[in-house]
Each structure stands twice: as structure tokens, then as C-alpha cells.
Amino acid sequence: MASRRQWGAGAGAVDVPAQERKGGKAATDHLLRAFFAVFFVLEGLSWRRRRRRDGEGVFLLRYVACLLCLQAAKIARRPKTTTVVAQQPPRIRRALADVSNLVNGRAALPVVNRQKAAAAAADKCRKPIKQRNENNKAAKPEVIVISSDSEKHKKNPAQRAASRRAPIQTLTSILTKCSRASDGVISPKKELIYDIDASDSHNELAVVDYVEDIYRFYRNTENTYRPLCTYMVSQTEINERMRAILTDWLIEVHYRLMLMPETLYLTVYIIDQYLSLENVPRKELQLVGVSAMLIACKYEETWAPLVKDFLVISDNSFSRQQVLSTEKSILNKLQWNLTVPTMYMFILRYLKAALGDEELEHMTFFYAELALVQYSMLFFAPSVIAAAAVYAARCTLGLSPLWSDLLEYHTGLAEPQLLECARRLVSLHAAAPESRQKVVYKKYASPKLGAVSLHSPAKKLLPPPSPVAA
């Protein structure tokens, strides 16, 4: 049975057989095809002549216009169809019920009892809430119920052991505690330490943020750069007395040339380090001392003295070429390493921690320069000599306390660790007026430096006098 479709709309719609509609459509297509076939044949015969006359642009525009007309004719001949369907009540799409978006058909909708569905949805929503409320009620007595002392004793041993169990420590927490303990972060002493760098907080050259790390590095590396305390054994022509004479003379030259204090301590270090590595003849010892001071001046001073100045001071005992040659030999032997922690660096820090006055400063440097002259003081590290010099100066001046917690914190040394070195320094002070090397004693006897060498040595640190034979 042939299908039928309603053409038009409303009450006047007429049913047209589908077979008749197909026949009319085919005839129209044949007529259009014949028309355009004739058109394109004629157009093809004359395209050369028109191309020459009108140009390629106009010809192409005409050709495109013909194609557009053909397409418009095809669109215009299509009839407008309207499908009349039985009137049905409007359907409201339920969520997730029909997502097919069908055009020519309808998806089968499930028959749902809305009251039952709403009740089921409400039950589903209430069940989790009810379950959570029950859990809360079950857990609530464990929080608020307080057991009596008698009930606590009734607990089994496993429960008592679990209650006494220490909290679990992770690897990160253990490593953090070890690191803080090694750096002194959790040390109880640090809470009592006065900030000696507070006054320099606005001074960028003081590097307050790094000063603790710098001096910790100095203390850790000072033994690496220390000269040998037994190098005199390998020297064949010089001895301790000759070294003392040379150092005493260099202190006088340093004072007359008004050089920086750092230059003096670096000069003595260079001499001792070079003598630890090289066997020096007796006649070249002064040349080594002059060349070492020239190197230290170039390293520390803003305006270093000239070579001829040292030649004049040494009474022209050697030539300019000898000084420069020895200077090069020393630098090569030391591998050009002049950045070392000297005694002077530690003294500056320890005096700051001592919170003393100018007199304490002069007395400390007096003991430090006495230590420079004596070869036997090489047995002690520079940081130990610096701390012992501060301790001996406080003992000599009668300051109290002799050694504070602040000094112990910044030096890392307790009072018993300083006694041996401090006793040697005070003994040198007691013997200075009668010693042959009196430059240091006379230098610090001047009022300009507080005449600190004229103070009586600390009797507390002097050895007891030997009994007088009857």
C-alpha cells in the first residue's frame, strides 16, 4: 500500500500519493539538466571569443554566476513540506530519561510512579545522614565519659602499654633535631647570649648575617694552614733565638712605618710557614723577613711601602733583585695562599664579646705580640692564643668575671682550656723587662697605648716561687 503524506497544513491539507510526487520531481530534474547542458555547450563554444573580449576576470565572474543560478534553481524547486501529526500533550523531558534527541521518532519513556520515586530518593538521601548520626552517637561516649581511678587500674596491660607508648618520630624530625643540636640552635646557652652584633646591624661591611658562619669556618680550618711547631728541627743554620730577633725587629719596622695590625700577623705567619717548608741559610733569614713583610703589605695595605723603603730600613744589606726573587720564591712555596685565619682575626671577635674598654684592648694586643716573638707559642692554635690573651688581660686588669658565658660561647673554649696558654703569656709578661727582645714591652709602655706593659702581671697565673735554699 502506497504511503501517503499530507501537503499543506491545517484542515485543508491534501493527501498526495508518494509515487506521483516522485514522477513530477524527476521531470523537473530532466528539464533543468537539459537547459543547463545546452547553456554550457553554447558557453563552451564561445568562451575563447569572450575571454579575449572581456578578459579573464569578467569571464570567471560570469561563470561563477551561472553556477550560483543553477544552485539557486535547485533550492527553489524544493517544495515546503509540513508534517501534520496527531495532537499530543507537551512532554517535559526528565533528567537522564531521554537524551537521544530523536527527530523522527520518540524514545520509549519508562512508566514511573512519581510518588514512589520521590519517596525512594528521599530515603536514599536520608540513609547516609542517619548512618553518620549513629556513628557520632557511638563515638560520643568515648570522648565525654571519664573513668574513675579504680576503672583505670582495671585496664589490661596492652591498653596501659599503648597509653604509655611514646609518639612516633619520623626520620625528618630526627635529622632536624640532630642538625639543630649540632649548630647550637636548641642549646639552652643560646637563650642567654647577648647579641654582640646588634650595633653593626646597619653596617653592610660587618656582614652580621654571616659573621657566625665565618668564624666557625675559621676555627674549623685554622689547623689546616698552621705552620709546623717543630720546623726548627729541620733547620740547620737558624734557631729559636734568631727567629725571635727577626720578629722583634719586624715589629719595630711595622710600628715605624705605621702599618695595619693585620700586616704584622700575616708577616709572621708567612715567615713560619716558609720556614716549615724550606731550609733557609742564616744570612738569608733577614731577607726572608723583609720579603714576607713586603708580601703582607701588598695583601693588606691600601698604600704598600716600596721596595726601596725596605732596603733603606735594612741598611742596604741586599739588593732589589734579591728581594723580588725571594718574594716570588715564598709565594710559589706557599702556593699563593695568603687568605688564612690569623690570631688578629680571632682577637677582634673575642674583644667584641668581652665587652671591654680600650685598656683591655691594648693589654690583649700586648700579650698577642709577646706570643708572636716566641717560637714555643706555635704549639697553640691562633684561636686559643687569642682567647688566652683576652683571659690573661682580664686577669691582669682584675676584671670580673674573668671568663663569662658570652666569651665561652663565642670562643668555644672553657676557662680550664685556656689556663696553660694564659700562664705562658703572663710568664712572658713577667720576663719582658729583663728580656733582650724589648721592642714589644717598650711599644706598649708608651702612654699612647695606655702603658699597659707597666702593669704587674697577674699573680694568679704565675707559677709559685721556688723555695730559697737555706
From Swiss-Prot:
Record-linked Gene3D superfamilies: Cyclin-like (1.10.472.10)
The answer to whether keyword Secreted applies is no
Q: Name one GO biological process term.
A: G1/S transition of mitotic cell cycle
Task: Spell out the SMART domains in the cross-references.
Answer: CYCLIN, Cyclin_C
Keywords (A to Z) from UniProt:
Cell cycle, Cell division, Cyclin
> A single GO molecular function, which one?
cyclin-dependent protein serine/threonine kinase regulator activity
Superkingdom, according to UniProt?
A: Eukaryota
Under Pfam families, the record lists: Cyclin_C, Cyclin_N
Entry GO CC = cyclin-dependent protein kinase holoenzyme complex; cytoplasm; nucleus
Family membership noted in the UniProt record? Belongs to the cyclin family. Cyclin AB subfamily.
**Name of the molecule in the record:** Cyclin-B1-3
Q: Which gene encodes it?
A: CYCB1-3
